[in-house]
Amino acid sequence: MSKQNKKDWKKFKDEHKEEYKVENEILEEETDEESQHQEPALGHPSYTALEEQLTLAEQKAHENWEKSVRALAELENVRRRMEREVANAHKYGVEKLISALLPVVDSLEQALQLADKNSDPSMHEGLELTMKLFLDALQKFDVEQIDPLGQTFDPQQHEAMSMQPAPGAPPNSVITVFQKGYKLSDRVIRPARVIVSTK
């Protein structure tokens, strides 16, 4: 900077010294006011606090995930159980009706045994036909007659009324059937009442 420029600058500064002074005072006052009205600075959490919060959030997320998995499994179990119950209701829904009709079948069998073929052949034929129609109707609903004469005794399907020695029959075989049994699908709704042979 030349000497002339320095002098001009000094002169300019001196002339405007008062203005700068006033301006600086105003700026300082504004700065003081702003600093008084400023909100306190937000505190930033520490690294360890953030780490703890993250750990807690991860634990909560894991717990919620486990709960949702358990809820889904329970829902699937309920769905399967309901499907099984509906299938069983369709399969075994007629069980009470069949059980109520079995005494009618028993009565028809007894009437057939008592009816004499020779004295009234048409009545005997009518009873046989009625019995056949009845058993065919039961078969349509997956009902099967259990007539175990000569078979080995099965406690799942037979009810032993008594035991008797039978020389011509193998031991533990059915020698007499008092009342035939019935199965609905694979479920025994009435076991056959039988006499079983002994040694």
Swiss-Prot record:
Q: Which CDD domains has this protein been placed in? A: GrpE (cd00446)
* Entry-linked InterPro entries: GrpE, GrpE_coiled_coil, GrpE_head
The ranges of region (Disordered) come to: 20-52
- Which keywords belong to this entry? Chaperone, Cytoplasm, Stress response
**What subcellular compartments does it reside in?**
Cytoplasm
Q: Which family does it belong to?
A: Belongs to the GrpE family.
Q: Which NCBIfam families match?
A: PRK14139.1, PRK14140.1, PRK14144.1, PRK14150.1
This protein is called Protein GrpE
